[in-house]
Design a protein with these regions (language model features):
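Active-site HxH/HxHxD metal-binding segment of metal-dependent hydrolases
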Residues: 2-77, 167
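Metallo-beta-lactamase
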Residues: 44, 51, 78-83, 88-171
Length: 171
């Protein structure tokens, strides 16, 4: 039986809730990890949504706060943390060998990218994250996206490549 050691958050923001805490209830020894810029999102939302004064904005709700370009070991796996701000200032992509998990930074090429109209989102940062931090990866790098909205009613897809993104991403 496999036991997860880490639960990775690519980002957090106000339009959806994370399932990480539910997973943590089932696997209490697993660490929840997120990029250390999460405090920027927490500060923004604390002000924007008038959260209680004592709401912590230091990322203390998470077990691990990752640094950009940090190499992390989890059991026999190793991954790289790549900050990819834009959708939120704290968006993070995780690279495992020849695969990346982008959250809302990139979607399938026929849908484009995540929104950047949330508080503290930035179209310029999102563009730079994709073109300078992800498009420098080999074209054959597998990309696992955070959502697939199935434009035109096509079948669900969740995997593409950096090469496909470069050639066909509509954004």
């Amino acid at each position: 039986r496999l036991m997860p050691l880490m639960i990775l958050e690519t980002h957090a923001h106000a339009d959806h809730l994370s399932g990480a805490q539910v997973l943590k209830e089932h696997y209490p020894s697993a660490q929840i990890g997120v990029g250390n810029k999460i405090s920027l999102v927490q500060e923004t939302f604390k002000e924007f949504f008038d959260l209680p004064v004592d709401f912590p904005t230091d990322g203390s709700q998470f077990d691990r706060l990752f640094d950009d370009r940090e190499i992390v070991r989890a059991g026999s796996l190793q991954f790289e943390v790549i900050f990819t701000p834009g959708h939120t200032p704290a968006c993070t992509t995780f690279r495992f060998d020849d695969a990346i998990f982008t959250g809302d930074t990139m979607f399938m090429p026929d849908f484009g990218t995540g929104r950047c109209d949330f508080p503290a989102g930035s179209a310029g940062d999102l563009y730079d994250s994709i073109t300078t931090r992800l498009f420098c990866l080999p074209d054959e790098t597998r990309v696992f996206v955070g959502h697939d909205y199935q434009p035109g009613g096509r079948a669900l897809q969740y995997e593409t490549t950096i090469g496909e993104q470069k050639r066909h991403n509509i954004q």
